[in-house]
Regions:
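Active-site phosphate/pyrophosphate-binding segments
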Residues: 132-173
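General structural signal for secondary-structure boundaries
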Residues: 1, 105, 127, 167-173
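Glycine-rich anion/phosphate-binding loops
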Residues: 1-9
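Conserved catalytic cores of soluble enzyme domains
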Residues: 16, 22-147
Length: 173
């Protein structure tokens, strides 16, 4: 939560758009960035994210399972893009079963074809690459007029982010 809180604060301060990839099952009891948490909902993350409404463009992309807090962030984005292989629900299998509502596999909860019909998903992509292309195109609509355009050397980025998207990396480098 602390990283996303910081991102939201910077986006608000500098009026920057945010593209968030929401795959995941939400918080876990063993999370260490919030030590006084019972349910994890008294953190500023969700209020900060919601507070960006009308200030910063928020685009959410999902590929795979997206439950709990991740689904809340996805649902509150201005534009929601999901792949055909997405399952999005406010509760995952453990919460549903723990609530006494039965046992379900993750693929039985919020499949993309249902969420598209319900209006949860704005754009359905065939895969994450196409979803990212959709986000890039949407961002281009909000950049305004460009008289002169420059970009820093992007080659250094290939060594900053790990090739496996599930690996951690030093965020302050």
């Amino acid at each position: 939560h602390m990283k996303l809180d910081r991102i939201c604060e910077k986006a608000k301060k500098y009026k920057l758009p945010i593209v968030i990839f929401t795959e995941g099952g939400g918080g876990r009891p063993g999370d260490t960035d919030i030590t006084t948490s019972i349910a994890g909902l008294h953190v500023p993350t969700f209020a900060l994210w919601g507070g960006l409404t009308g200030r910063c463009l928020r685009i959410a992309i999902n590929n795979g399972f997206c439950f709990a807090g991740n689904a809340a962030l996805f649902g509150c984005a201005d534009i929601r893009i999901a792949t055909k292989n997405s399952w999005i629900g406010m509760a995952g299998p453990a919460m549903i079963e723990g609530g006494g509502l039965g046992s379900y596999s993750p693929k039985e909860i919020g499949p993309s074809e249902v969420n598209e019909k319900n209006g949860v998903i704005d754009l359905v992509a065939k895969d994450e690459a196409e979803a990212t292309d959709f986000a890039k195109k949407i961002l281009s609509y909000f950049q305004g007029d460009l008289v002169d355009w420059k970009i820093e050397d992007q080659a250094q980025l290939k060594d900053i982010m790990p090739k496996n998207r599930k690996w951690s990396y030093p965020i302050r480098n």
